[in-house]
């Protein structure tokens, strides 16, 4: 594809390129591996130096990036433009409508038009699924579930009884939606299992990635709001909620009845104690342990969590502790002389 056509489709301007019709691009590649027929991108300042020595045929950059040797595709949001550029060259697999003969579908289930139902899929009683759904091999949809249009469930995903799922939802491999929450009451002879009578709701445009779990509530609901994105190996406890446009990275854990606001980012291995509220726009660094409510807009780190800047300063001091101890011992020795 000619660079001029790429720029037109992406809505970008070109710089450092006198003849964009002469530049032919065949793939999108990382900056370090890019060759003369590849387009790459720079959105992180740490790669600015590499951008000036790369052999790429073109680079997607910000409006204020200084010119290097390659033609520049200028964008107000280079990372988003990079994501859209991939779609110009990559064609996702297409799944023809139809029902595999090994699928088991209840006669009371309703499946919308253009459905693609793979091998050994199970759809139980009184399920309602919208149009254009794709259910890959061994997906199981329990009784009473309602699902909107354009649902995509990869192999071995499970949606438990009476859950509600909106439009354009994606479940990656091994996801479990609506399993029993972890609820037990102390009894005289051990633990009494609390019936998990509630449900789990996923709103429109939610994506849950591989082997993550969203438990059903004991009463009420566990709710993942629109456009939230949940990474691999995330555990969301019963009765919790995740606000619109929030990102939960790999190995995040939310204990029961914890509530995450809108536009929140929880980096890898963040743990949130139960019955807490995390305000809108909060960013938590990796491995943060949240044990108190967090006000909107805060940046936090550490375990237990506190202000991110203070956490960074504390970490810097901690790395100097051997040196500081040595200095203190020298001072104590001089004082005793």
From Swiss-Prot:
SUPFAM superfamilies: Trimeric LpxA-like enzymes (SSF51161). PROSITE patterns: HEXAPEP_TRANSFERASES. It is an enzyme of class 2 (transferase). Pfam families: Hexapep, LpxD. It catalyses: a UDP-3-O-[(3R)-3-hydroxyacyl]-alpha-D-glucosamine + a (3R)-hydroxyacyl-[ACP] = a UDP-2-N,3-O-bis[(3R)-3-hydroxyacyl]-alpha-D-glucosamine + holo-[ACP] + H(+). InterPro entries: Hexapep, LpxD, Trimer_LpxA-like_sf, UDP_GlcNAc_AcTrfase_non-rep. Pathway: Bacterial outer membrane biogenesis; LPS lipid A biosynthesis. Its EC number is 2.3.1.191. GO terms for biological process: lipid A biosynthetic process. Belongs to the transferase hexapeptide repeat family. LpxD subfamily. This is UDP-3-O-acylglucosamine N-acyltransferase 1. It comes from Koribacter versatilis (strain Ellin345). The lineage of its organism: Bacteria, Pseudomonadati, Acidobacteriota, Terriglobia, Terriglobales.
């Amino acid at each position: 594809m000619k660079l001029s056509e790429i720029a037109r489709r992406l809505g970008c301007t070109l710089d450092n390129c006198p003849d964009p019709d002469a530049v032919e691009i065949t793939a999108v590649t990382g900056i370090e591996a890019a060759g003369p027929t590849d387009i790459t991108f720079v959105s992180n300042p740490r790669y600015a130096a590499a951008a000036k020595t790369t052999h790429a045929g073109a680079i997607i950059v910000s409006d204020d990036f200084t010119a290097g040797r390659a033609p520049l595709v200028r964008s107000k949001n280079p990372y988003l433009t990079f994501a859209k550029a991939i779609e110009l060259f990559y064609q996702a697999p297409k799944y023809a409508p139809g029902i595999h003969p090994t699928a088991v579908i209840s006669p009371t289930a309703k499946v919308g038009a253009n459905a693609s139902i793979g091998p050994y899929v199970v759809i139980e009683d009184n399920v309602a699924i919208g149009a254009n759904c794709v259910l890959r091999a061994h997906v199981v949809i329990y009784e009473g579930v309602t699902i909107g249009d354009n649902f995509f469930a990869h192999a071995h995903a499970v949606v438990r009884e009476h859950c509600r799922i909106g439009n354009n939802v994606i479940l990656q491999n091994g996801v479990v939606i609506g399993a029993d929450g972890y609820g037990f009451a102390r009894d005289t002879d051990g633990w009494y299992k609390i019936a998990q009578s509630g449900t789990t709701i996923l709103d429109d445009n939610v994506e849950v990635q591989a082997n993550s779990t969203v438990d059903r509530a004991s009463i009420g609901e566990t709710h993942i709001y629109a456009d939230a994105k949940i990474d691999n190996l995330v555990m969301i406890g019963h009765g919790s909620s995740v606000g619109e446009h929030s990102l939960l990275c790999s190995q995040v854990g939310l204990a029961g009845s914890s509530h995450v606001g809108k536009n929140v980012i929880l980096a890898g291995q963040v743990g949130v104690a139960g019955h807490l509220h995390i305000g809108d726009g909060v960013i938590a660094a990796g491995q943060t342990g949240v044990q108190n409510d967090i006000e909107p807009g805060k940046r936090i780190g550490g375990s237990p969590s506190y202000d991110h800047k203070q956490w960074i300063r504390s970490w810097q001091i901690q790395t100097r502790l051997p040196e500081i101890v040595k200095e203190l011992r020298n001072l104590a020795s001089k004082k005793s002389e």
